[in-house]
UniProtKB/Swiss-Prot annotation:
GO biological process, one term: chemotaxis
InterPro entries named in the record: Bact_Chemotaxis_MeTrfase, CheB_C, CheR_C, CheR_MeTrfase, CheR_N, PAS, PAS-like_dom_sf, PAS_4
Region (Disordered): 923-952
Residues covered by the CheR-type methyltransferase domain: 168-440
Originating organism: Rhodobacter capsulatus (Rhodopseudomonas capsulata)
Name of protein: Uncharacterized 104.1 kDa protein in hypE 3'region
Family annotation (PROSITE patterns): CHEB, CHER
Gly residues bias (residue ranges): 936-952
Length: 952
């Protein structure tokens, strides 16, 4: 590959080595069978783990996004498979740019198509256009914080988004901060997400990125673009709501959830019961499916199978569609345990599909966590890495809604950077590290969103008004008491809602199926209902008392017997004439006599009038409803924009959290690697220290500046050096050597990179062999040298001893305590060479001299040999201090005589010195003239034994 690329570029093409630093205008190639990541400006290599799916492009893109954020540019070119798909998501989430080769232009379109399908690709281009596009983007990329001079997109006044009402240049002169505010407002009005609930930093970075992609120089120009280009508005909205999720995100947290929440829930579930779970902000569904798999795993382990229902919600419809489909790229294999992949997925066409039994337990629905009503009676509520995108007040609203949703004793599971804060007193902590809580008490019903009044005016609920004034009740009872012998009666308001009851009215009441209400239309028995409604309507219209004709009641309705009943409505006098404040008494009178003259009610006429009025009200209601529908459509658009803004903030903070998590994981891995290197270094140091101690030689290490880097304990005998001297120049230290050229020799060794040896003497009378050896630190330019001082005094003494005995005419050998020869002199060596043993194989160092004398008995008079052996042994064993004897040792045709002396070596090792001197001339003279031999044998001190022994 390197040679292939080199033919098409003038830039150097290099294959990466570990810790290689980035360089401009250079092409770096990843070596085979490795994973390459980026740490700062250095490339790190690691071997592939063949036990798991290898995705080197994803790994590199992710590390690049973590390190460079919005400065990262990812390009996916021709290739098979889906490697790079997850990585472009990480780059996009960090604010970087992702580009793919146009699949139509690619020889293998698998990787580009997979990346484009994520929605994270900013542009799909032909191969020849990618380079110029990136260069132009980097030149024109704006810096939003510098453009606005502000940090908050607040205070915008609103702007119309109808293309027909916006003219090019209409925003000229607008301040950048105001332009940013209008952009956020337009964005919020484009859907059901209010982006004012999102943290401003997220919004700013996303707008900056889109401005860079569209190459727009300033905010006012981008505002005009948004008002004219609905496609760009949709792209910006998608930018804010890009989902960032994965299976088993934070595996340790899910393991803790399974142990402390899921297993107990399964164990406590009754037969036939249902476990209810709500996962809010589910994105593309990975978290919901993770929970379902964990519950199924717990079911199998416990042998219990309660019904499981998971409600997975998200504000973005596209995310819900993706999640509901249940199709996932092959890259998820890196996130899931192998057993779960095999149990809960099927593979087809390079994709993983969730199994039907898992899919059927999950209901995916669009839901706005901040505005839509929450679910109820949940055993578990999860909302991970969503709150971190919200402003604090929005976080509180979301938390209170989730508190209302979870039952007492249920569980709440949040993301790693999220906390309860405002509702923490209502929960107990199960795992602070993994953000798991248990509800202690039920939550209050969430209040209507503070912005709801801008869009919807809710109708007052038809429920009991607990705050009805007591004085009105009393006035109603007083009116009834003055007029009648009090019959059973009800006090109702202008909405026909019951406020109070007088007497026994239960037989006239009947609770109907459906929503609870105190409206008489939901409470009176059927025969009385139309009459009571007509009477109340007439009394309200005329402002006077109204009574019905006698109403026949069949048996079994109000009692066992048939009866007749008359209804009467009496207005209650109050201090206000408003319709809303009017109260009425509805009395139930038994019909026991003729009409009392009070005007009755013509049911047909009153019903007709009522119908006319209701038709008029219906027409007005329709007009009002149409206006409300239009208002709701506008409100829905604003809410959608708000939801999109929140989702984008969620994604941005989640991306930041993912980056931090990735950095944390990389730091943990790096820490483990460093710890391993430290352990190895400690072992190496211990080995080196032990080696220098056992070698018992003075050793000093210096760097290229001749500064001491370390030394052995023995070096303190020659140099006045201590631990505090590490880091000092060697020349500053005094030493006990006659070696003025020490520093010069070290410099020559470093410059020539060659070994240096020299013998020097010490001021203490000892001698040393100095060895200098240069070295280089691997993968570094650092160099140094090590110098050792070997004490060779004993060797020099031995050499001196050898020179002394070599100067003697006698044949000298030194024996150890066993009779083995340790040392011979030159005369001994010459004699052996002249007498058949030139290589000293039989009489040289290492041979046993006593043994050689025993062997010689066959060739020489055994008496001499025997006495020689006994004499030498007596000296070796300490029985004699000196042994001497004369013996013949003839050469061919020449008789010769020798004298042998043996003296012990003093010391713990023992041994002896044996010397042989030729005395042939002396012996001949002695035999010729005995009187001339009075001086004794040559070399004898006159105390030795007589006799001779063969020379071995």
């Amino acid at each position: 590959m390197a040679s292939l690329l080199a033919r098409h570029t003038k830039m150097p093409v290099v294959t990466v080595e570990d810790e290689m630093e980035l360089a401009a205008d250079t092409v770096f190639l990843i070596p085979p069978a490795t994973i390459m990541t980026l740490e700062g400006r250095h490339l790190r290599l690691a071997p592939k783990d063949r036990r798991v799916l290898s995705l080197p492009i994803d790994a590199f893109f992710t590390s690049m996004a973590a390190g460079f954020g919005s400065r990262a540019v990812a390009v996916v070119l021709s290739g098979t498979g889906s490697d790079g798909t997850r990585g472009v998501g990480a780059v996009h989430a960090a604010g970087g740019v992702a580009i793919a080769q146009d699949p139509r232009d690619a020889r293998f379109d698998g990787m580009p198509r997979s990346a484009i399908a994520t929605g994270f690709i900013d542009s799909a281009l032909g191969i020849e256009r990618i380079g110029p596009w990136i260069a132009d983007y980097l030149i024109r990329r704006p810096r939003l914080g510098q453009l606005t001079g502000a940090e908050r997109p607040d205070g915008a006044t609103g702007v119309a988004v109808d293309d027909d009402r916006v003219a090019v240049g209409q925003f000229d002169g607008l301040e950048p901060a105001e332009a940013l505010g209008r952009i956020v407002e337009i964005l919020s009005l484009s859907g059901e997400v209010n982006f004012l609930d999102y943290k401003p930093g997220t919004v700013q970075r996303r707008i900056e990125r889109r401005m860079g992609v569209r190459q727009v120089p300033d905010l006012t120009s981008y505002l005009e673009l948004l008002t004219h280009d609905r496609t760009e508005l949709a792209s910006l909205r998608r930018e804010m709501l890009i989902p960032v999720t994965s299976f088993f995100r934070d595996p340790d947290s899910f393991a803790e959830l399974a142990e402390k929440v899921i297993d107990p829930l399964v164990a406590q579930a009754a037969v036939g019961s249902t476990l209810r779970v709500w996962t809010a902000g589910c994105a593309t569904g990975e978290e919901a499916y993770t929970l379902a798999m964990l519950f199924f795993d717990a079911f199998e382990r416990a042998g219990r199978w309660p019904t499981l229902k998971i409600f997975a919600t998200d504000v973005e419809p596209m995310n819900i569609e993706t999640a509901a489909a249940g199709f996932f790229a092959e890259t998820i294999a890196a996130d899931l345990p192998t057993t779960f992949l095999e149990r809960f997925f099927t593979t087809r066409g390079g994709q993983y599909t969730i199994r039907p039994e898992i899919r059927q337990t999950i209901v995916f629905a669009r839901h706005n966590l901040l505005s839509d009503p929450p679910f109820t009676r949940m055993d578990l509520v999860t909302c991970r890495n969503t709150l971190i995108y919200f402003r604090p007040e929005a976080q509180e609203r979301a938390l209170r809604r989730m508190h209302y949703a979870v039952r007492t004793g249920g569980y709440l599971f949040l993301g790693g950077s999220e906390a309860l804060v405002q509702v923490q007193d209502d929960f107990s902590v199960l795992s602070a590290r993994h953000r798991i809580w248990q509800a202690l008490r039920p939550g209050a019903a969430p209040l209507t969103d503070r912005r709801a009044g801008l869009y919807v005016t809710p109708r007052p609920p038809a429920t009991r008004r607990d705050n009805a004034p007591v004085t009105a009740v009393e006035r109603g009872f007083a009116t009834l008491s003055r007029t009648y012998a009090p019959p059973p009666a009800l006090l109702v308001n202008s909405h026909h809602e019951i406020l109070h009851s007088y007497g026994e009215v239960s037989r006239f009441m009947q609770m109907r199926e459906g929503a609870a209400s105190l409206e008489i239309g939901r409470m009176l028995v059927e025969p009385l209902l139309p009459v009571a409604s007509a009477l109340l309507f007439k009394s309200a219209r005329l402002g006077e008392e109204a009574a019905s004709d006698s109403i026949p009641i069949a048996e079994g309705i109000l009692g066992p017997d048939p009866m007749r009943l008359r209804l009467r409505v009496v207005p209650v006098k109050q201090g206000t004439d408003s319709d809303e404040g009017r109260l009425y008494i509805l009395a139930f009178e038994p019909d026991e006599g003729p009409d009392d003259g009070i005007s009755g009610i013509d049911i047909d006429r009153e019903v007709g009038a009522r119908i006319e009025m209701l038709e008029a009200e219906l027409a007005m209601t329709r007009e009002s409803l149409q206006a409300m529908i239009e208002e709701l459509e506008t409100s829905n658009e604003e809410l959608q924009a708000t939801n999109e803004e929140m989702m984008a903030s969620n994604e941005e903070l989640q991306s930041a959290n993912e980056e931090l998590q990735s950095v944390n994981e990389e730091l943990n891995s790096l820490n483990a690697e460093y710890q391993e290197k430290i352990d190895l270094l400690n072992r190496s140091n211990a080995d080196l220290d032990s080696l220098t101690e056992i070698m018992a030689m003075s050793t000093i290490f210096v760097d290229s500046e001749l500064t001491v880097t370390r030394f052995s304990p023995d070096a303190a005998e020659l140099f006045r050096i201590r631990d505090v001297d590490v880091g000092r120049p060697l020349g500053d230290l005094t030493h006990r050597l006659d070696y003025p050229a020490l520093l010069d020799d070290l410099r020559r060794t470093l410059q020539g990179q060659s070994r240096t040896e020299r013998e020097v003497s010490g001021l203490n009378g000892r001698h040393y062999l100095v060895r200098m050896l240069p070295y280089r630190v691997p993968s570094s330019a650092a160099q140094g040298a090590v110098v050792t001082f070997v004490d060779i005094t004993q060797t020099r003494n031995l050499q001196l001893l050898q020179a002394v005995i070599d100067g003697l005419a006698e044949h000298v050998a030194v024996l150890d305590g066993h009779g083995d020869i340790l040392l011979v002199n030159a005369a001994w060596t010459r004699f052996a060479a002249d007498n058949g043993d030139p290589g000293l194989a039989h009489t040289g160092v290492g041979t046993n001299y006593v043994g050689r004398c025993d062997i010689g008995e066959a060739a020489i008079d055994s008496g001499y040999a025997k006495r020689a052996v006994e004499g030498i042994r007596s000296v070796l064993t300490g029985k004699q201090r000196h042994f001497t004897m004369e013996y013949p040792c003839d050469a061919p045709g020449q008789p010769r005589w020798f004298v042998m002396h043996a003296r012990p070596l003093d010391g713990a090792r023992g041994g002896a010195v044996v010397s042989h001197i030729e005395i042939t001339r002396w012996h001949n003279q002695t035999e010729a003239s005995p009187e001339t031999s009075s001086g004794g044998l040559p070399g004898s001190d006159g105390t030795g034994a007589d006799g001779g022994a063969p020379r071995a």
